[in-house]
Amino acid sequence: MRKILRFGVIGLSMWGSLLASGLAQTATPVASVAAVDLTRYSGKWFEIASFPMFFQRQCVANTTAEYQANNSGGIRVVNRCATEKGVDEAVGVATVVPGFGNSRLKVSFFWPFSGDYWILGLDPEYRFAVVGSPNRKYLWILSRTPQLPAPLLDAALAAAQAQGFDLKELRYTSQKTN
């Protein structure tokens, strides 16, 4: 009986430790970078990798995003990708969430619905950006060029991992050049 009780206490203790460590990892909030210069951030970005998403299911290659300030104070967003049937394009508007140095945006492709667009990692030279959501369901690695050199890709992946993103779901995007 003592043996059973001792193993039961050890088992409960181990289970409690595992539960607490799992909660501690997932409870750490995602943080966006301190500041983003939206003028430098504007322009064309190539998707290097992303989590699979329903709204990108038809994309087979050449996924890009373009950002440009518009006259109403927002940011025009144009997402494009190659599909089996040609090119798919989605046009939306992003607005800055005040108080976060332009690193948190709300993006809407279909009013009144919007999603979180948080810049979680940003190369000092703006060569790559790590973008995700605070619930860790969305993640993109973006680059100014169709291919991201290995050291920069490693830095981008490290930034995502530091925010608690599980990179097992990450899918790399084919950027075919003609």
Question: What function would you assign to each model-found segment?
Answer:
Residues 2-178:
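A beta-rich soluble binding module of mature secreted/lumenal proteins
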